[in-house]
Structures are given as C-alpha cells and as structure tokens.
A protein has these predicted regions:
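Extracytoplasmic small-molecule ligand-binding "clamshell" domains
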Residues: 1-23
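Short beta-strand-to-loop elements that line the ligand-binding cleft
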Residues: 1-4, 74, 91-98, 105
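Short, hydrophobic alpha-helical packing/hinge segments within bilobed ligand-binding/sensory domains
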Residues: 7-12, 102-105, 111, 120-121
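A ligand-binding cleft/hinge motif common to bilobed small-molecule-binding domains
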Residues: 22-33, 83-86, 112-143
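Flexible hinge/capping segments at coil-to-helix
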Residues: 53-71
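Ligand-binding clefts/hinges and TM-proximal coupling segments of bilobed small-molecule sensing domains
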Residues: 79-89, 132-138, 161-186
Length: 186
C-alpha cells in the first residue's frame, strides 16, 4: 500500500502493515522500536548525504556555520533530519513530509537548504537547474550507510524470512542491477 515515508513507519509501529521498505537507514531509535532487517545495498544514495541549496547561494553556504539561524528542511523521521539536528546545530530544522514538497519549499525561499540522500540530490538537481548540491556534506557514520527493512517489534519470524531473502539476493549479486534500475527509473 503506497504511503508517505513517516506514515509508513507509523503503520508498521501500529501493526497496520507487516513491514515497510522505504530506504530506511539504521538508527538507534528505529532499532529500539522496530525489528530491522540486515543491511541491504543502497549505493551512494546512503553513504553520502547532501544539502540542496539555490544556485544563487552556492558561495554563501559552504560550511555548517554558514547555515546558523537558517531554516533547513529534512523529511520527517529520516536520517537526514537526524543529521541536520546533530551536525547543523545552529540551523533551524524544519520537518518536511515529502521530498517533493521540500524542493518546492526550497525553491520558493521558505527554507534555505534541504537535506537529502546524495543520489536523490543528483536527480533533483538534474530536474531543477536553479538548485545545486552544497559543497559541504554530512559526516555519515558507517551504520547509516546502508538500508534496512522495517517490521513491527516482535515479528521475528518475518524478520528471519526477510533476512534469508536479502542473503539470497546478496549471494546472487542482484543489488547492483536493482540499484542501477532504480536510479534510472528515478
């Protein structure tokens, strides 16, 4: 069932759906509240996290200090929101429900920057020539550099089945092709 990023987490938490696959990075909070699968390959999309800014501000925002006092958007309940909060301590984190809305907020001047996974940033910039990727990037810890599938806490049988499928996909070297196809579709 298609739903928004933050809504899908709530649906798993309440048991409305058995699991969610939505590019989730591992976080301590998620590990405490959900069953999380083994990591699966997410390409450069998770290993690098970036800030989108208006092209006209490319020289203005080159370090975290430059964003002090500025509104910086990130998707609700995302790794990017965690990174904005932890690494842009002088900025004002603004919760965005959807990346597309975040891009509109950035372009209209309601926020000064938008935190997104690097792969997403590249696709957004390709479609929006008035935006650029900030030269400064977030420092991403190794445990955040891959994705996990989220299940309701206690669903260990489902977790075991999902992990077995992920192991088979890894063994068959399927991730690279899937990732390439997903990027092309994006």
């Amino acid at each position: 069932e298609p739903m928004g990023f933050d809504a899908s987490q709530t649906a798993v938490y309440t048991g409305s759906v058995p699991m969610s696959i939505s590019g989730y990075s591992w976080t301590e909070d998620r590990a405490q509240n959900y069953e999380l699968s083994d990591y699966y390959y997410a390409g450069e999309n998770e290993t690098r996290q970036a800030l989108l800014i208006k092209k006209e501000n490319a020289d203005k925002y080159t370090s975290p200090d430059d964003l002090a006092g500025q509104d910086v958007g990130a998707q609700n309940a995302s790794l990017q929101m965690q990174l904005v909060t932890e690494q842009l301590t002088g900025a004002n984190p603004i919760s965005i429900g959807d990346i597309t809305v975040g891009v509109m907020e950035l372009k209209s001047g309601n926020i000064e920057a938008l935190a997104v996974a690097y792969g997403n940033a590249e696709m957004i910039v390709d479609a929006n020539p008035d935006l650029v990727i900030c030269t400064w990037e977030f420092d991403v810890k190794a445990e955040y550099s891959a994705n996990v599938i989220m299940m309701q806490k206690g669903e260990t049988e489902l977790l075991d089945a999902v992990n077995a499928i992920l192991a088979q996909a890894k063994e068959a070297n399927l991730y690279d092709g899937w990732y390439k196809d997903a990027v092309e579709l994006g």
